């Protein structure tokens, strides 16, 4: 339980810093002349760098341990937020998201840390704890960012810098290493073959499709939403901060308390299916909502759907994988998700520049296709013993069940 708490607070502080810039970013980008495609590019490049970092940092953490990877990325995050605070042009803002996106790849190390300290039976609950840290970070961060913006455009970024440095100092003293030296493996850091291996497994393929399409649709939605809300409902940083706070509080409540109870009753597969279709409807109705109150209400439905989907999908990846390849498959899923988050923002942003309504309908349709893919998932296999988690396979793994 103590180790759960340590990684929870490490991820929490990291995500508060991330959440601080969320309600500021679309208006910051518009200040430099960015429309749908330009803002989508800022969001997409963050995920592109997260994809690169996910491929690198998960394997690097297998080689040198989780702790040094997490500590180093906290310092890199501070650099990215410094650039954000003092961005004087679109391209400096773009560069700041490149740096922060690379640091954001540390989530693979954080999830591997949680997997190291849990048994397969506890793994979905452990991922729910990480998800709760996301939720609370998204609750607190946007509120802090919206408040800090009253003190100047640099203030939110500087607060995020301070939090990143504070996170580094606290983690340096309280975050122990979770991966024993004898379990560490040296592999090529930029070998992306694990993505193809995961997709090639019939048992895993539908889940990999879900992992690609859900982030694509959701990330595209996050580009269209603030632009539409500003144009149609007159939203500013305050209103957007409230929306992100609703998402964060809901995620923290669902993943931190309710998810463990729900997943034991209905299972991960059912939650993945329900979550994708719930998000599809909540996204598609947005351009037809005439008031902020209705948009906030549907945001709650979206947040509940996403909050049950995310840890359930992560848990399914873990239990579907071969015992000595769990980290490999989890890393592949994270990388595929990052590619979806890279493609979604410029795609939906470009469509938004042509038609706001079409952008939401497209994002909702993509989410619905993900739901159909989830229907084809095989029953969850049984696992009986804890296994070490890596982001690269062991030499000569046993054949898969596929």
Segments and roles (model prediction):
Residues 51-90:
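Conserved MFS/SLC helix-loop-helix module at the cytosolic interface between two early adjacent transmembrane helices
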Residues 1, 176-209, 393-397, 401:
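Juxtamembrane intracellular "pre-TM" segments in multi-pass secondary transporters
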Residues 130-173:
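Helix-loop-helix hairpin linking two adjacent transmembrane segments in secondary transporters
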Residues 269-313:
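C-terminal transmembrane helical hairpin of 12-TM major facilitator-type secondary transporters
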Residues 54-65, 254-268:
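Helix-to-loop junctions at the C-terminal end of transmembrane segments
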Residues 19, 47-55, 105, 138-139, ...:
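Residue-level signature of mid-helix packing/kink "hotspots" within the transmembrane helices
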Residues 23-37, 223-239:
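Short amphipathic helix-loop junctions that connect adjacent transmembrane helices
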Residues 96-135:
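Cytoplasmic helix-loop-helix junction between adjacent transmembrane helices
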């Amino acid at each position: 339980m103590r180790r759960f708490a340590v990684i929870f607070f490490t991820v929490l502080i990291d995500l508060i810093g991330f959440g601080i810039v969320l309600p500021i970013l679309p208006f910051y980008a518009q200040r430099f002349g960015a429309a749908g495609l330009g803002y989508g590019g800022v969001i997409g490049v963050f995920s592109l760098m997260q994809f690169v970092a996910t491929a690198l940092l998960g394997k690097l953490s297998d080689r040198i341990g989780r702790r040094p990877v997490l500590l180093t990325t906290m310092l890199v995050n501070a650099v990215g937020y410094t650039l954000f605070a003092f961005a004087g042009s679109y391209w400096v803002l773009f560069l700041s998201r490149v740096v922060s996106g690379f640091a954001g790849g540390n989530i693979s190390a954080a999830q591997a840390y949680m997997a190291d300290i849990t048994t397969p039976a506890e793994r979905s609950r452990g991922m729910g704890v990480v998800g709760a840290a996301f939720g609370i970070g998204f609750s607190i961060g946007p509120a802090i960012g919206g408040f800090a913006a009253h003190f100047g455009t640099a203030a939110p970024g500087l607060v995020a810098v301070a939090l990143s440095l504070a996170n580094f100092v606290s983690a340096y003293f309280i975050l122990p290493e979770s991966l024993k030296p004898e379990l560490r493996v040296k592999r090529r850091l930029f070998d992306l073959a694990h993505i193809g291996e995961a997709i090639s497994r019939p048992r895993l393929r539908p889940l990999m499709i879900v992992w690609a399409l859900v982030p694509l649709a959701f990330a595209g939605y996050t580009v269209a939403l603030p632009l539409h809300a500003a144009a149609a409902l007159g939203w500013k940083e305050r209103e957007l901060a409230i929306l992100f706070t609703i998402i964060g509080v809901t995620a923290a409540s669902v993943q931190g308390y309710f998810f463990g109870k729900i997943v034991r009753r209905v299972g991960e597969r059912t939650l993945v299916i329900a979550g994708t279709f719930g998000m599809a409807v909540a996204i598609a109705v947005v351009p037809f909502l005439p008031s902020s109150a209705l948009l906030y209400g549907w945001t709650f439905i979206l947040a509940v759907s996403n909050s049950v989907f995310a840890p359930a999908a992560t848990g399914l990846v873990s239990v579907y994988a071969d015992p000595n390849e769990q980290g490999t498959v989890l890393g592949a899923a994270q990388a595929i998700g990052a590619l979806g988050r890279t493609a979604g923002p410029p795609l939906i942003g470009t469509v938004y520049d042509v038609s706001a309504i079409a952008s939401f309908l497209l994002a909702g349709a993509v989410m619905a296709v993900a739901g159909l893919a989830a229907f084809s998932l095989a029953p969850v296999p049984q696992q009986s013993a804890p296994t070490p988690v890596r982001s690269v396979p062991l030499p000569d793994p046993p054949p898969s069940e596929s």
